[in-house]
Amino acid sequence: MAAQLNPFRNAFRLPSKQRINWFPGHMTKGMRQIQQKLRNVDCIVEIHDARIPLAGRNSQFFDTITGSGVKPHILVLNKVDLLGAKQQKSVLQQLRRQQPELQHILFTNCKDQRNNGVLDILPLATRLVSESSRFNRTQAAEHNLMIIGVPNVGKSSVINVLRNVHLKKKSAARVGAEAGITRSVGERIKIQENPPVYMIDTPGILQPSIKDDEMGMKLALVGCLPDHIVGEDLIADYLLYWLNSHRKYDYVEMLKLSSGPSDDISAVLAEYAHREELFHKVKQYDGRVEVMTNLLAAARKFIHFFRSGQLGHMNLDEPSGFR
């Protein structure tokens, strides 16, 4: 069968001289604090966004944290409701091809406290700790779990859900819908009485330099970077590129585009903004005020449709639908 030609862009390129990097001072401080506390940590729980199972995971950093596999390690892919159940098997295959040593992977949805993945975290961690050698630990009766991962993947939410499920207590870790809410390594938070289990929340940490532009755009699209670092217009353009390259055209109906799929983000946003009456006043150089379509508001709406799952289930790391 002949390969289907791609009528859209076959690659996404950033504007000239633009690079995606976000490594504020609190990340450097957080890395230092994490390494200082590792001595008394029994198990590493890595939280990541299920929609980007590969993008943004710094294997070198995690090797350092886990002592190249000496400390037990659980990978928790959160926000699985936005990935979808049908894609879980292929995600597991992707991960194990890239990182064969990964043995313990859970899918979680912190919006559902009865989610099996959430409920499996503590029993699995407890078993792994009991089976491992616990070096430099003076209080063997306690289990200390450290939560790590990139920003805005639900690390604090996981802690709060586990605390509520096992202790029936309210939230203890700050959460938010944007990257960078947790800015330092926190104190131990108790999440279980018997045996005593504590969790240590940590700030989201990215690679100091993101050399792969598309990986950076994936991180931006799911919200691991603050939107203003990259720009909503560029994030919306990458979303359009990704949807087209994977033959996912539900956005046409969602945005009510009259001309069908398009590769022109400016035209897409302009048509949507006009239809939804998204306008703003712009003062011109001569003092006149003109009413214009608000492309930024339209871009934010488009991104919201993706992040809320209204465009369907997505694995941003799946291969393109075109060859």
Curated annotation (Swiss-Prot):
Which positions fall inside the CP-type G domain?
A: 31-208
Q: Which molecular-function annotation in GO is an example for this chain?
A: GTP binding
Keywords on this record?
A: GTP-binding, Membrane, Mitochondrion, Mitochondrion inner membrane, Nucleotide-binding, Phosphoprotein, Transit peptide
Q: Residues where Phosphoserine occurs?
A: S308, S320
Q: What GO terms fall under cellular component here? A: mitochondrial inner membrane; mitochondrial matrix; mitochondrion
Q: Which Gene3D superfamilies match?
A: 1.10.1580.10, P-loop containing nucleotide triphosphate hydrolases
Identify one Pfam family in the record: MMR_HSR1
- Indicate which residues the UniProt annotation says bind GTP: N78, K79, V80, D81, N152, V153, G154, K155, S156, S157, G204
The UniProt entry's GO biological process terms, in alphabetical order, are: mitochondrial large ribosomal subunit assembly; mitochondrial translation
InterPro entries per the UniProt record, alphabetical: G_CP_dom, GTP-bd, GTP-bd_ortho_bundle_sf, GTPase_MTG1, P-loop_NTPase
Q: What is its main location?
A: mitochondrion
Location within or outside the cell? Mitochondrion inner membrane
**According to its record, how does it sit in the membrane?**
Peripheral membrane protein
Q: Which family does it belong to?
A: Belongs to the TRAFAC class YlqF/YawG GTPase family. MTG1 subfamily.
Q: What function does this protein fulfil?
A: Plays a role in the regulation of the mitochondrial ribosome assembly and of translational activity. Displays mitochondrial GTPase activity.
Spell out the protein name for this chain: Mitochondrial ribosome-associated GTPase 1
Q: What is the lineage of its organism?
A: Eukaryota, Metazoa, Ecdysozoa, Arthropoda, Hexapoda
